[in-house]
């Protein structure tokens, strides 16, 4: 299961993480976001020792998405050593996400 991150826990969970972090920015009303859930869950299990995978509900946590300029969801961001490394927007296939993550970290 993928853990949630909030505006208040973002710095500690993401920016100060020893592992690279993938954050899935989503909303309850977003159809493509719901389609991405099982893919994100599988990636989290497969990469559990290499990458921390988190989800952020943008309706419940508007500050962080605004700071990172998120205008469309789902948006997936990769962070490493406290810095944003790369971004993917829209529904993604598992294999393309895995390739992207492995190249980015």
Curated annotation (Swiss-Prot):
Gene3D superfamilies: Glutaredoxin. SUPFAM superfamilies: Thioredoxin-like. CDD domains: TRX_family (cd02947). GO terms for cellular component: cytoplasm. Disulfide bonds join 30-33. One of its GO terms (molecular function) is protein-disulfide reductase activity. Pfam families: Thioredoxin (PF00085). InterPro entries: Thioredoxin, Thioredoxin-like_sf, Thioredoxin_CS, Thioredoxin_domain. Residues 1-105 form the Thioredoxin domain. Keywords: Disulfide bond, Electron transport, Redox-active center, Transport. Component of the thioredoxin-thioredoxin reductase system. Participates in various redox reactions through the reversible oxidation of its active center dithiol to a disulfide and catalyzes dithiol-disulfide exchange reactions. Belongs to the thioredoxin family. PANTHER family: GEO12009P1. This is Thioredoxin. It comes from Rickettsia prowazekii (strain Madrid E).
